[in-house]
């Protein structure tokens, strides 16, 4: 079960823009991430590689946690992301992340957002 302090540290790393570093530091080796109903990606190394590839397509990433809840091993975070592609196109969207933690590390995460609502 994550402490509030641990969750706040995780959020701070993501908000700093170090998304791949957050995965390296706060996810279990066998962690999984799932976007909406897509098949999950599994394994911390896979998750880090995917995140680095996504970030490489961006010139700027803004991440802000609007609220977060901890209930035992379960965490919910409401995120606002603003992604600026290298072409200058800006995409902004709201996302809810549901996480399951093992101690102070995330082992399962699922993201919920409306892809049609990604504003360009």
Predicted segments — roles?
Residues 81-83, 101:
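Hydrophobic beta-strand positions in extracellular immunoglobulin-like domains
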Residues 61-64, 78, 91-97:
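Short, surface-exposed coil-to-beta transition loops
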Residues 1-18:
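Short, aromatic-enriched amphipathic alpha-helices that serve as compact interaction elements
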Residues 45, 87-90, 118-120:
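A short, polar/proline- and glycine-enriched secondary-structure boundary/capping micro-motif
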Residues 94-120:
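Short beta-strand edge/turn micro-motifs at domain boundaries
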Residues 57, 83-92:
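Short, cysteine-centered beta-strand-loop-beta hairpins and adjacent loop/turn segments enriched
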Residues 6, 20-73:
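A solvent-exposed, acidic/Ser-Thr-rich amphipathic alpha-helical stretch
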């Amino acid at each position: 079960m994550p402490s509030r302090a641990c969750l706040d540290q995780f959020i701070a790393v993501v908000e700093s823009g170090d998304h791949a570093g957050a995965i390296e530091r706060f996810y279990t080796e066998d962690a999984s991430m799932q976007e909406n109903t897509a098949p999950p990606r599994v394994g911390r190394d896979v998750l880090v590689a995917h995140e680095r590839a996504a970030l490489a397509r961006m010139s700027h990433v803004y991440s802000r946690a609007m609220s977060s809840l901890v209930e035992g091993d379960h965490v919910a975070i409401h995120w606002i992301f603003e992604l600026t592609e290298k072409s200058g196109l800006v995409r902004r969207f709201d996302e809810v992340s549901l996480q399951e933690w093992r101690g102070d590390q995330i082992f399962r995460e699922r993201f919920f957002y409306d892809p049609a609502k990604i504003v360009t």
